[in-house]
């Protein structure tokens, strides 16, 4: 089977990570794959915030947990790093563009044997005063909206292989 198709079939959301950070070259390759995601009219309306700083990651996780309704929760599952995908809401297809970036990030991670998971609530995070403060710290205006948090790390989970697919999801006309 073609290697790209194999990765697409075998990629899983990972929720158990070892604590060590990713190798710089692996992280850079994942980021680059995200930057090459398709975008509407090639406007490239996204920004990737690579979070390697444990204190910043903890701030994001606390906000995410609060939005989820579990203030003491750990919705980042111990991942040592994350890439926050933001999109410029001045562009009409900002959400779609950011979603394509998220897919590329997760598929690139899988191709490198690195675990990843899309963690929701990024949009809500950057609507909160604390999230807006983070945007300001990063030099970004309030037009930047959260699309997703791609948590990353070397996995503690066994590789799972193919996943079953639901029937009746394709209609040829």
Write out the residue ranges for each language-model feature.
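Acidic, surface-exposed loops and disordered segments
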Residues: 1-173
């Amino acid at each position: 089977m073609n290697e790209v198709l194999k990765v697409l079939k075998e990629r899983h959301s990972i929720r158990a990570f070892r604590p060590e950070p990713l190798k710089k070259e692996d992280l850079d390759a994942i980021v680059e794959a995200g930057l090459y995601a398709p975008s509407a009219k090639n406007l490239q309306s996204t920004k990737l915030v690579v979070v390697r700083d444990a204190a910043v990651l903890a701030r994001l996780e606390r906000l995410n947990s609060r939005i989820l309704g579990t203030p003491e929760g750990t919705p980042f599952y111990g991942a040592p790093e994350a890439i926050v995908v933001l999109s410029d809401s001045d562009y009409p297809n900002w959400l779609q563009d950011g979603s394509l970036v998220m897919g590329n990030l997760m598929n690139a991670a899988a191709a490198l044997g690195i675990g990843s998971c899309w963690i929701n609530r990024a949009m809500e995070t950057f609507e909160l005063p604390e999230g807006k403060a983070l945007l300001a710290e990063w030099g970004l205006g309030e037009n930047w909206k959260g699309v997703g948090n791609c948590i990353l790390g070397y996995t503690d989970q066994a590789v799972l292989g193919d996943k079953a697919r639901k029937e009746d999801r394709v209609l040829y006309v």
